[in-house]
Amino acid sequence: MTRTHFDSIRAGGLNWSSLPLKLFAGGNAKFWDPADIDFSRDRADWEALTEREREYATRLCAEFIAGEEAVTKDIQPFMSAMRAEGRLGDEMYLTQFAFEEAKHTQVFRMWLDAVGVTDDLHSLIEEVPAYVQIFCEELPAALEALTSDPSPAAQVRASVVYNHVVEGMLALTGYYAWHRICVDRGILPGMQELVRRIGDDERRHMAWGTFTCRRHVAADDANWAVFETHMNELIPVALRLTQEGFALYGDDIPFGLEEGEFLQYSSDRGMRRFGTISSARGRPLAEIDVDYTPLQLEDTFADEDERALTAVKAAAAAAN
């Protein structure tokens, strides 16, 4: 391959108003270092939990850290696909995206080390078949497919798995579980800070995935069917993951969590993505590039979570 030009020095320069570069600037402005999070109190809170509670929390953390490792490893083909399209802004953002995923892997490992969990945890995720299907089969297959087929349809399929199911349903539901555990009891302040920081990063990641699907749907309406079909295939698997995880604990789910609440939460986060993607149908591509609707959707989800957790705090305070 011979390089023939540089996008950064062409006439007009870069479009800093485009969504990918807005996300890039946002990530720079909100940089954080895992080493700055204080996990010192978490160890004492951890030891005060029951054995059953510690097992549940360890499983939840194992699912997160393995998932963060998986997405760190699997994102590279998307960068190559953006390069093939000549989209420097997206490439720039995805370098930051990959760095943040690696940082998330780091910080979950630091937390496990801080609370003294150093055992092999593979068995905890292997007991959840839907987790294995998504993270060991669907995710790597969809992203690896981009190495030989970086077409818009292949990109949409990859984004569905990565951005809309793994991040947009499973990760959000997991963060919500951590918040419910920590906020309800007033425990694990380091984990609370960790989840807050990661959640902020992930909102940008999900917004990029939504943007990518929207621009492909706007360019070719056939890609709407690709999105819709693959989401409808994977949403049941994502919901099954939640069901399988809770089923391991029978009628005595630790921390007083309720399966129905989390199934509703996960389903809601998945289904509301359809409208944001479909709203791009028939739109001019130039409009999509500077339309911040994807980021606004994630901010709406974050605001809703904040209100729900404020209500949990109020209820806990009233009970005491």
UniProtKB/Swiss-Prot annotation:
Which positions does UniProt annotate for Fe cation binding? 101, 167, 202, 205
Q: What is its EC number?
A: 1.-.-.-
Q: What class of enzyme is it?
A: oxidoreductase
CDD domains in alphabetical order: RNRR2_Rv0233_like
Record-listed cross-link 3-(O4'-tyrosyl)-valine (Val-Tyr), residues: 71-162
Provide the coiled-coil residue spans.
Answer: none
Q: Which cofactor does it need?
A: Fe cation; Mn(2+)
Q: How is the cofactor bound?
A: Binds 1 Fe cation per subunit.
Which InterPro entries does the entry mention? Ferritin-like_SF (IPR009078), R2LOX (IPR033908), RNR-like (IPR012348), RNR_small_fam (IPR000358)
- Record GO terms (molecular function): metal ion binding; oxidoreductase activity
To which protein family does this belong? Belongs to the ribonucleoside diphosphate reductase small chain family. R2-like ligand binding oxidase subfamily.
Record's subunit section: Homodimer.
Q: Which NCBIfam families match?
A: PRK08326.1-2, PRK08326.1-3, PRK08326.1-4
UniProt-recorded name of the protein: R2-like ligand binding oxidase
Name of the coding gene: nrdB
